[in-house]
Swiss-Prot record:
The lineage of its organism: Eukaryota, Metazoa, Chordata, Craniata, Vertebrata. Ca(2+) 1 binds at residues 66, 74, 119. Ca(2+) 2 binds at residues 142-143, 145, 167-168, 171. GO terms for molecular function: calcium ion binding; serine-type endopeptidase activity. Residues 1-17 form the signal peptide. The active site is at residues 502, 557, 654. The CUB domain 2 shows a compact folded structure in the presence of Ca(2+), whereas it has a flexible, disordered conformation in the absence of Ca(2+). Ca(2+) could provide a switch between the folded and disordered forms; low Ca(2+) could provide flexibility to promote autoprocessing and activation of CIR. Belongs to the peptidase S1 family. This is Complement C1r subcomponent. Cleaved and activated by autocatalytic processing to generate Complement C1r subcomponent heavy and light chains that are connected by disulfide bonds. The iron and 2-oxoglutarate dependent 3-hydroxylation of aspartate and asparagine is (R) stereospecific within EGF domains. Serine protease component of the complement C1 complex, a multiprotein complex that initiates the classical pathway of the complement system, a cascade of proteins that leads to phagocytosis and breakdown of pathogens and signaling that strengthens the adaptive immune system. C1R catalyzes the first enzymatic step in the classical complement pathway: it is activated by the C1Q subcomplex of the C1 complex, which associates with IgG or IgM immunoglobulins complexed with antigens to form antigen-antibody complexes on the surface of pathogens. The modification Phosphoserine is found at residue 206. It comes from Macaca fascicularis (Crab-eating macaque). Residues 142-190 form the EGF-like domain.
Length: 705
């Protein structure tokens, strides 16, 4: 209840009749002239009214009236709801009268009547007495219309809610139990259960009036809708009773249950349905009744459980499910990986990772992948080499092994210090799907040309005047050039030509462009060489000390030609080695000079060679002075041959090398380059000392390596 206490101005009463008070929530009522004595021979009735939905509460703050037996002379009479609430007079503590004291007077309705009556005089034992009268406060108090009917007998005070009554300050409203609908009169209820919706995670549902008889002619639809990912469980309680027939199944009344739109049962009779795990978050219960019957109906409790997904199962023995759980439910997930050396495959697509999530319908959002062994693919081809499988031929999957090797004896695998060639060339297909070597990683090895090891080396133990025709494979490094006439050179590695600078830039001639450089390799016959085609030149490098304009100075007479493409080495095409010490220039050491130059004043068609000793430097200097020549003979040159040998390099042999066999390694070394001389077979020949230019040669070759 809500009580409102406030004061308002005093109300003065007049003799005779009734005085209505304007409808307010609170106020006061006084006797005339209060607190002065009230007049004689006075009667009036004050009507106190509060808004509908409230009751009137009245309390006297001050009360001083003439006392009398039975309050016959002066009195205040209070009535409400057609009932007399009392007749009062006197004062608190007087021997006569009936003062109200602090008693609270309460109406059942929104009206209260207060009648004030005085007689013709106020005397006591011949003495005139003065009485102040009364002061009373009233207030509106909320009326609980939903409480039981008062004893006043006023039927309009009792709400006629058929089902449920709800009180509020100043009024009330009616509502109906689930399955019923409030009618237009706002008091009565009629069955209406065609669209009952339940969304809580658990609860109870029953037929109307359960466990009393349900109403006739029902068409009820109870829908349970919970969050996706939950599954509903139904458990029917006792008693279960729906009209039935002994011979026909549920002809009168029936309860139908649907889950996911599918009918999972139709029930009647007295046998309680079994418990249902619907595997659905949506269930509908349809209850139909005919016009008769007195069965008690049904009631169920529904609960929810998070939906579960089936236990994930791998498709092969190589798939691994991380942290496998005993069960998986909605929103759980699992991660699948592969054992070492295998990779995830979904359809035809390679996956880097795999995660599957349990969906709200109890299925995984993607199918289990399979694990396929890693395939490293076909091993890369090794230039100037090949590979062989040390495991199953043609199988390139995880743990497969191959051995790279070079085409010997023409190439040899580059190895690190302290490592073996077999270790350098052994590659394994790793778990990452990459061919890998323990030392070199993914990088494949290199096959380096083997220098100075001809398959068919020259054998010459005697001097032959005018030289000798070379056989195939005697001088496989020999190069035939045709620039400013015939010239020679030697193969270094598989794409460099060592030659004399003056074959490219002859003394007192103009420079020649790369386009006119003709280079041939791989045969001892000129005509056959021409058939093998020219090797294009990518770059020409002339030593900076070479001076084309100084005709008697062949200082720095050395050059390098870089081929556009590497050549493939073989028995007739092999490089020569570079010197690494001065012993290759010891006096009398025999060397070989080969070329396609002039022989007996005729152009040679075949490769020929001569065998010459390294000459004494002083003898060569003396011989030059005897010829009255001003030619420069520097420390970067050496001489070979002897005036008595009648053998020498000649025109067309320039650029070829002076080749010496190293007895310690059995390798052939290019110690010199045919540079200059005086005539052919008429004395000493002069050669560029290659040892003094090895650093320059290596630097030039490394720039493009």
């Amino acid at each position: 209840m809500w009580l409102l206490y406030l004061l308002v101005p005093a109300l003065f009463c007049r003799a005779g009749g009734s005085i209505p008070i304007p409808q307010k929530l609170f106020g006061e009522v006084t006797s005339p002239l209060f607190p002065k004595p009230y007049p004689n021979s006075f009667e009036t009735t004050t009507v106190i009214t509060v808004p509908t939905g409230y009751r009137v509460k009245l309390v006297f703050q001050h009360f001083d009236l003439e006392p009398s037996e039975g309050c016959f002379y002066d009195y205040v009479k209070i009535s409400a709801d057609k009932k007399n609430l009392g007749r009062f007079c006197g004062q608190l503590g007087s021997p006569l009268g009936n003062p109200p004291g602090k008693k609270e007077f309460m109406s059942q309705g929104n009206k209260m009547l207060l009648t004030f009556h005085t007689d013709f005089s106020n005397e006591e034992n011949g003495t005139i007495m003065f009485y102040k009268g009364f002061l009373a406060y009233y207030q509106a108090v909320d009326l609980d219309e939903c409480a039981s009917q008062s004893e006043s007998g006023e039927k309009d005070l009792q709400p006629q809610c058929q089902h449920l009554c709800h009180n509020y300050v100043g009024g009330y409203f009616c509502s109906c139990r689930p399955g019923y609908e409030l009618q237009e009169d706002r008091h009565s209820c009629q069955p209406e259960c065609s669209s009952e919706l339940y969304t809580e995670a658990s609860g109870y549902i029953s037929s109307l009036e359960y466990p009393r008889s349900y109403p006739p002619d029902l068409r009820c639809n109870y829908s349970i809708r919970v969050e996706r990912g939950l599954t509903l469980h139904l458990k029917f309680l006792e008693p279960f009773e729906i009209d039935d027939h002994q011979q026909v199944h549920c002809p009168y009344d029936q309860l139908q249950i649907y889950a996911n739109g599918k009918n999972i049962g139709e029930f009647c009779g007295k046998q309680r349905p079994p418990d249902f795990d619907t595997s659905s978050n949506a269930v509908d219960l349809l209850f139909f009744t005919d016009e008769s019957g007195d069965s008690r109906g049904w009631k169920l409790r529904y609960t929810t459980e998070i939906i579960k997904c089936p236990q994930p199962k791998t498709l092969d023995e190589f798939t691994v499910i991380q942290n496998l759980q005993p069960q998986y439910q909605f929103r759980d997930y699992f991660i699948a990986t592969c054992k070492l050396g295998y990779q995830l495959i979904e359809g035809n697509q390679v996956l880097h990772s795999f995660t599957a999530v349990c969906q709200d319908d109890g299925t995984w959002h993607r199918a289990m992948p399979r694990c396929k062994i890693k395939d490293c693919g076909q091993p890369r081809n090794l230039p100037n080499g090949a590979f062989r499988y040390t495991t199953t031929m043609g199988v390139n999957t995880y743990k497969a092994r191959i051995q790279y090797y070079c085409h010997e004896p023409y190439y040899k695998m580059q190895t690190r210090a302290g490592s073996k060639e077999s270790e350098q060339g052994l590659y394994t297909c790793t778990a990452q799907g990459i061919w890998k070597n323990e030392q070199k990683g993914e990088k494949i090895p290199r096959c380096l040309p083997v220098c100075g090891k001809p398959v068919n080396p020259v054998e010459q133990r005697q001097r032959i005047i005018g030289g000798q025709k070379a056989k195939m494979g005697n001088f496989p490094w020999q190069v035939f050039t045709n620039i400013h006439g015939r010239g020679g050179g030697a193969l270094l590695g598989d794409r460099w030509i060592l030659t004399a600078a003056h074959t490219l830039y002859p003394k007192e001639h103009e420079a020649q462009s790369n386009a006119s450089l003709d280079v041939f390799l791989g045969h001892t016959n000129v005509e056959e060489l021409m058939k093998l085609a020219n090797h294009p030149i990518r770059r020409v490098s002339i030593h900076p000390d070479y001076r084309q304009d100084e005709s008697h100075n062949f200082e720095g007479d050395i050059a390098l030609l870089e081929l556009e493409n590497s050549v493939t080495l073989g028995p007739n095409l092999l490089p020569i080695c570079l010197p690494d010490n001065e012993t290759f220039y010891d006096l009398g050491l025999m060397g070989y000079v080969s070329g396609f130059g002039v022989m007996e004043e005729k152009i040679a068609h075949d490769l020929r060679f001569v065998r010459l000793p390294v000459a004494n430097r002083k003898d060569c200097e003396t011989w030059l002075r005897g010829k009255n020549r001003l030619d420069v003979f520097s420390q970067n040159m050496f001489c070979a041959g002897h005036p008595s040998l009648k053998q020498d390099a000649c025109q067309g042999d320039s650029g070829g090398v002076f080749a010496v066999r190293d007895p310690n390694t059995d390798r052939w070394i290019a110690t010199g380059i045919v540079s200059w001389g005086i005539g052919c077979s008429k004395g000493y020949g002069f050669y560029t000392k290659v040892l003094n230019y090895v650093d320059w040669i290596k630097k030039e070759m490394e720039e493009e390596d």
